[in-house]
Amino acid sequence: LTPPVDMWRQRWARIGLIDGDGRAVAGKEADLLIRAGRAARLTRRAGAVDFAAGPTAGQIAEYLRRAGIDYALTGDAGANRYRSSAGEAWPVLYVEDVDRAAEAAGLARKEPGSFGMRVTLIPFDGVSEVGRVDIAGVTVVARDQVVIDAYGGIDRMVEQADILMGRRVA
């Protein structure tokens, strides 16, 4: 384990969220995923690049599939693939290569410091791509990764994560 990962494991073990093996304590899974999401906000992910709003996550996924670029939906679009509960406010995708993916999808970078709607591409990091699933022909990150990302997201994403965790009714 890297020192930062070990630090988080120690913190979460001290407050009773994980056991000595690093596994979530029964009944504490949602609490652990909430804390992980809040500690790793989507807006601050390493290598994340924002692009001008335009295509939906599903459209971008199709462009990437046609170009042979590895990807996985997350955030509200990913949560909706597991259980539809809200409109898509912010397309966020993990990709194997941000520049190639942006080119294939015809995305234009947002100006630094600009606000408003956006599309965000985040490079795979060795963890986010583990457990991906195909849902109706679209690749989506593992359910727990969607939940972490939704808890680390904006607006209705937190509610979507709660719905996926059974903490709220759609």
Segments from the language model and where they lie:
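Short amphipathic alpha-helical interaction segments
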Residues: 2-11
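Helix N-cap and loop-to-helix transition residues
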Residues: 4-5, 75, 142
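C-terminal regulatory/effector modules of DNA-binding transcriptional regulators
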Residues: 98-170
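Glycine-centered loop/turn motif at secondary-structure junctions
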Residues: 1-2, 15-17
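Short gly/ser-rich loop at a beta-strand->alpha-helix junction or flexible surface loop bordering the NTP-binding
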Residues: 16-20, 24-125
